[in-house]
Amino acid sequence: MNEDIFVEDIRGWKEFLDSVGEVAKPHLDSTKITKLIYSAAIAFCCYIDLTKDGDQKTPGTFFEYLIGHLFAKRLGINPTKQLDVLDLDIQATLPTDFIFNLGKEKPKFHLPVKTSSRERVIQVWAHQRVLDGVYGTGRFIGTPVILGETKSDKRKKEVIEICLPDQWRIYQMHIAQLKRIYYLDVPAAYNKLNEVFPRIAVRPFGDFFREVDALAQ
């Protein structure tokens, strides 16, 4: 848990939820939004760590539902998790991460959700590549949301960040283009990807609620 961004008093959570779906955009600033969501997510993860030994699935499922709910509330639509594949011979569907369809002649949001990018993050770019290949580049906006990259080293009794920025640059150049990568706890190594080629837009998740309308244009 990152104490610098953890908020014990989350009375602002209700204010955020009440305003998140408004067209006028949430009243809270991006930094406070990110801290509130981080606190809600990491508190649950800590509880599971303390009460259930080795349970990694439950925190991941909770985080997926939390982020999917906030996306849906902001966009005003519910997601799907499969898409019809155009095929001349068979009817087939493609299982996906959350897909938010904004309507005719508008882009769709492709939302992978992960507690860390160590969970086979290359699949995020691979799924985006499939969507681009099947439906056309630009139809789906790739916007993964990740909790953080910290891991406890029990031997050294310290918390470390595990990041692979050079691999991300290769994925972005040679597999597919992700529009944004949102974090609740932005790693310094990935934040630097905003400044090098190919630029990967790594942002605090709170930014999404203010910039989503521009992204959807």
Question: What kind of feature is each model-predicted range?
Answer:
Residues 58, 62, 66, 93, ...:
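Short, well-structured alpha-helical interface segments that form or flank functional binding sites
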Residues 73-92, 98-101:
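A short acidic/basic microdomain associated with nuclease active sites
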Residues 56-57, 87-89, 110-117:
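Short, surface-exposed loop/turn motifs that are enriched in glycine and acidic residues
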Residues 99-109:
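Active-site beta-strand-loop-beta-strand hairpin of nuclease catalytic cores
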Residues 57-58, 80-83, 132, 203-206, ...:
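Intrinsically disordered, low-complexity Ser/Thr/Pro/Gly-rich regulatory segments
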Residues 147-217:
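Domain-level recognition of nuclease-like catalytic cores that cleave nucleotide substrates
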Residues 1-75:
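Interdomain/boundary linker segments immediately adjacent to catalytic/signaling cores
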Residues 112-168:
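Catalytic cores of nucleic-acid endonucleases
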